[in-house]
Amino acid sequence: RRLFSFATADDMMRLCEGVKDQQSWQVAIRRFVETFVGYVTVTSKPGVYAAQIFRWEVTCPSTISRELQLAYGNKVYEVLRTLLTMALGDDADAVKIWGGAIWSRIAALIVIDKSWVSHFVPRGVGRDEWLRRVSDNICESVFGSLHYRG
């Protein structure tokens, strides 16, 4: 549990608080995306251990998968669902589709083996800059299609 408390900061659960308009909604979405892009690509301990467990559970769920889902995953998914509902209303299918699209793009970063990095990272671009660009790209796809409705 302590290991995953690093990967599920308490303030993630408070992202929806204070969202009242398009600008604050975009800030919350961006923070969600940037936070999880950072979590799944972390290179220092103890975060790297949490990222490795997350990678394993995403690709080959084990017996602890359900416990992780109940303890952490459901809360984090609820934050994203709440943020998406602010733009999509009560359309549960659209919320699931958008949630899946966002998560799949973040989760793809977990499984990129170092030997494949050259296929995804532009030559001469540092890790932090690349991660910022990836986060920007994910957010721009959301902001180009969805708008805060309350």
Residue positions per predicted region:
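Amphipathic alpha-helical linker/stalk segments
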Residues: 1-28
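A short, mixed-charge helix-start or loop-turn motif at secondary-structure junctions
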Residues: 14-19, 62, 123-127
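C-terminal peripheral helix-coil segments that are non-catalytic and often amphipathic
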Residues: 27-45, 74-97, 101-150
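Amphipathic alpha-helical segments used for helix-helix packing
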Residues: 44-67, 113-119
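Short, solvent-exposed amphipathic helices
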Residues: 68-72
